[in-house]
């Protein structure tokens, strides 16, 4: 339970005495969908890691408020801290994708003593959902027809296709996340960071810019992947596990052998 009374669902895997990796999913996804069904949990536990996967507020089995004020980026970063405190974890490694990467950027800046290194997948600078048309989205869920804006329609269609998603909560999250500090080249965390973005993702150059501005950033281009299918990439998983283990990661996944 968070300080503002929100129940945040967590999932624990592996040996609790091993070093911990925290997994935080993307927009409209869930801990199990983003990480367990895609092989991440299996591979991390197989590498001897203790894994905590989080359903972010508004997602999965966590509470789904319809109040945008519940979803400031600082609040989502604080949820990560609450989970660390609940599990009595002094220091962890972090893996986040898309929304989870943006939250990880903020959490790494706010709590550098708790997050030793982070994998930030599919992260651009700023807020990638600035163009999301809130009123068109609300009209859609009220039965008023599909959004005219293509980006808004794409995200709503994707979210609606995932069981148990609450579209009103997700729209509130988009609105609430517009408040507060966003990732920029001027506010990079100082921990070692692995930036991983699909070669076919439109945000790839913005991800590269964030990496270049990070004191200890490494960039990994996920071959043949876009923003939506990058999390299932075996090359991405292999690069992330290598990075977390302190093994140098090549700039491209072309030479990585899948597991």
Where are these regions (language model features)?
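Conserved HGGG/HGGXW glycine-rich cap/lid loop of the alpha/beta-hydrolase fold
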Residues: 6-63
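Conserved alpha/beta-hydrolase "nucleophile elbow" surrounding the catalytic nucleophile
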Residues: 25, 92, 96-101
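Active-site loop/oxyanion-hole signature of alpha/beta-hydrolase fold enzymes
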Residues: 36, 42-46, 53-93
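Flexible "cap/lid" loop of the alpha/beta hydrolase fold
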Residues: 102-110, 116-145
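Active-site nucleophile elbow and catalytic-triad environment of alpha/beta-hydrolase enzymes
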Residues: 169-185, 200-202
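Short beta-strand/loop motif that positions the catalytic acidic residue
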Residues: 189, 195-197
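Short alpha-helix in the alpha/beta-hydrolase fold that links the catalytic acid
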Residues: 204-212
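Catalytic histidine-centered segment of alpha/beta-hydrolase-like enzymes
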Residues: 225-237
């Amino acid at each position: 339970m968070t300080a503002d009374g929100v129940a945040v669902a967590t999932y624990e895997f592996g040996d609790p005495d091993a070093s911990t990796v925290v997994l935080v999913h993307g927009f409209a996804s869930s801990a199990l969908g983003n990480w367990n069904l895609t092989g991440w949990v299996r591979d991390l536990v197989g590498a001897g890691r203790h894994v905590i996967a989080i359903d972010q507020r508004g997602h999965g089995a966590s509470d789904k408020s319809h109040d945008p004020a519940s979803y400031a980026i600082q609040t989502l970063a604080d949820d990560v801290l609450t989970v660390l405190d609940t599990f009595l974890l002094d220091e962890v490694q972090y893996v986040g994708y898309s929304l989870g990467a943006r939250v990880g950027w903020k959490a790494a800046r706010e709590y550098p003593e708790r997050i030793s290194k982070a994998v930030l997948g599919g992260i651009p600078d700023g807020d990638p959902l600035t163009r999301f048309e809130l009123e068109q989205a609300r009209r859609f869920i009220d039965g008023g027809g599909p959004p005219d804006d293509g980006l808004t329609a794409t995200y709503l269609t994707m979210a609606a296709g995932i069981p148990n998603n609450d579209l009103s909560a997700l729209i509130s999250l988009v609105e609430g996340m517009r408040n507060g500090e966003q990732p920029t080249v001027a506010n990079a965390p100082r921990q070692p960071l692995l930036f991983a973005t699909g070669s076919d993702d439109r945000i790839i150059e913005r991800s590269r810019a964030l990496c270049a501005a990070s004191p200890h950033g490494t960039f990994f281009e996920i071959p043949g992947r876009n923003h939506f299918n990058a999390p299932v990439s075996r090359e991405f998983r292999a690069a992330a596990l290598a990075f977390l283990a302190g093994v140098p990661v090549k700039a491209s996944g072309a030479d990585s052998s899948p597991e």
